[in-house]
Amino acid sequence: MASENMTPQDYIGHHLTNLQMDLRTFSLVDPHNPPATFWTLNIDSMFFSVVLGLLFLAMFRSVAKKATSGVPGKFQTAIELVIGFVHGSVKDMYHGKSKLIAPLALTVFVWVFLMNLMDLLPIDLLPYIGEHVFGLPALRVVPSADVNITLSMALGVFILILFYSIKMKGVSGFVKELTLQPFNHWAFIPVNLILEGVSLLSKPVSLGLRLFGNMYAGELIFILIAGLLPWWSQWILNVPWAIFHILIITLQAFIFMVLTIVYLSMASEEH
C-alpha cells in the first residue's frame, strides 16, 4: 500500500478509510466517492470485531475443557490470571448481587483488549492482503478505532444501566431519581431532569468516545510514521511507540471494563 505513486496524504487517507457497504444496494462503496448516507456499514470493523469475539470464546472454551486440577500449562495459567484479576475488580467495585456482572466484565476486558491489539500489526500487512488477494478497495483492521464500534458497545452498557436502575428501584423509583435529585422539591423537577438526564446520557457517550479517541490517535501515529518517514528510519520510532502502545491498549481495555462495572454498580444502588 505504500506504493511509490502514493503521496503521503493519499497513503494516510487510504489507511483511514473503511471498507463500507451501502445497505440499500448491498454493494461496496467506492472509497474515492463515499456517499454521505446513514445506510452505510463499515464491514471491516464489523468483521474483525466479530472474529475477535469468536476468538475470545474459542480460547476460553478450549481452556475450560482442558482445565486440570494439576499443574496448569502456561496458557491456562494466563487465562486464570486474567479471570482472577477481573473477578477481583468486580468484587471490589460492584456491591450488588448479580451473576451477570463478572462474565460481562471479563468479556468487555478481553474483547476490547483483542480489538486494541490489532493496532500492533504492521500497518500494511492486512490491507495489502485485502487488496491483492481479495481485491478490496480499502481495509481498516482496528475495530476500536471506529467510533461506530465503540459507541455501539457503550450503548449496550447504557441499556444495562437502564435495566438495572429499573430492576433495583422500580419504574417509580427510577423516575424519582431523575426528577427529585439533586434538589428534592417538585419546583425543581425541570432542573433536576435536565441535570440527571445529561449525567445519564454522558456515561455512554464518554465511555465510547474515550476508547475511540485513544485508539484512533494511536492508529494515526503508526500511519504517520509509516507514511511520512523513509522505510529505513521507521523502525527507530515504530518500535518504541509499539512498546509504549502495549501499555495504552491494555489500559484502555481496563478503563472500559472499570467504568462499565462502576456505572452498573451505581445503577444497582438503592437510594
From Swiss-Prot:
PROSITE patterns the record matches: ATPASE_A
InterPro entries noted in UniProt: ATP_syn_F0_a_bact/chloroplast (IPR045082), ATP_synth_F0_asu (IPR000568), ATP_synth_F0_asu_AS (IPR023011), F0_ATP_A_sf (IPR035908)
Superkingdom of source: Bacteria
Topology in the lipid bilayer: Multi-pass membrane protein
Keyword RNA-binding set for record: no
Cellular compartments annotated: Cell inner membrane
Disulfide bonds listed in the record: none
Cited Gene3D superfamilies: ATP synthase, F0 complex, subunit A
PANTHER family reported for this sequence: ATP SYNTHASE SUBUNIT A, CHLOROPLASTIC
Chief localisation class: membrane
Recorded GO CC terms: plasma membrane; proton-transporting ATP synthase complex
Protein name: ATP synthase subunit a
One Gene Ontology biological process: proton motive force-driven plasma membrane ATP synthesis
CDD domains registered for this protein in UniProt: ATP-synt_Fo_a_6
Bilayer-spanning residue ranges: 38-58, 100-120, 146-166, 220-240, 242-262
Assembly and binders: F-type ATPases have 2 components, CF(1) - the catalytic core - and CF(0) - the membrane proton channel. CF(1) has five subunits: alpha(3), beta(3), gamma(1), delta(1), epsilon(1). CF(0) has three main subunits: a(1), b(2) and c(9-12). The alpha and beta chains form an alternating ring which encloses part of the gamma chain. CF(1) is attached to CF(0) by a central stalk formed by the gamma and epsilon chains, while a peripheral stalk is formed by the delta and b chains.
